[in-house]
Amino acid sequence: MLSLGTSGVYFAVSDGFKANPQSAVHSFCHALPGSWHLMSVMLSAASSLQWYADNVANTPVAALLDELQQANVDATQAPLFLPYLSGERTPHNNPDAKGVWFGLSHSTTRAALTYSVLEGVSFALAQGAAALHDSGLQPDDINLIGGGARSPYWRQLLADVLQRPLSFRESGEVGPALGAARLAVLAINPQATLDDICPQPPLVSQHQPSAERYAALAPRYQRFIALYQRLADLF
């Protein structure tokens, strides 16, 4: 499961303990007996977009996303954005990391800046997902939840970056609260089964990754990784 909220969390469940502490992957006992869960966590996901909307664009997020949807931005010419507005956890574990725009020019449009924020968050989530996968856990199905998941554009971009199908389900924007409520019901009803209390919500949309779009994104992803590595000692 991928949560695109204020922070960004890639969450997976295992029936045994797995870990990758070198890359700041969290490993915990699950609330459900006999299970473990792993998380990769980035500290500024959808909050990066909100920061940009409030402090740079001075425009509501919804209007910026509508503008981007209609703008046909050339992603290969957009700036790169490092979304480390609150430092970063997985995979860098660096509280001193900072946000960066790289590659601004006179031709950079507002829509290109909006795109760069979505892309930068997506790249950071991809790095976190890779760190979790390095623990040996490889989820087959990824459901997308959180407020940022309301954007079909962002959902598709994430599918392209991760190169995995992403499912967005009914009430996905409030997924964490729904999950907490279901755990509470299980706790006070010990005879209830997981299937009874936790049915899969209806599917709203599924986003298939595009190999063609990934071919354009892959070099930018490598530059994104290299940019942090070159700047890390300067933060």
What name fits each language-model region?
Residues 1-145, 150-235:
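Active-site core segments that coordinate phosphate-bearing ligands/cofactors
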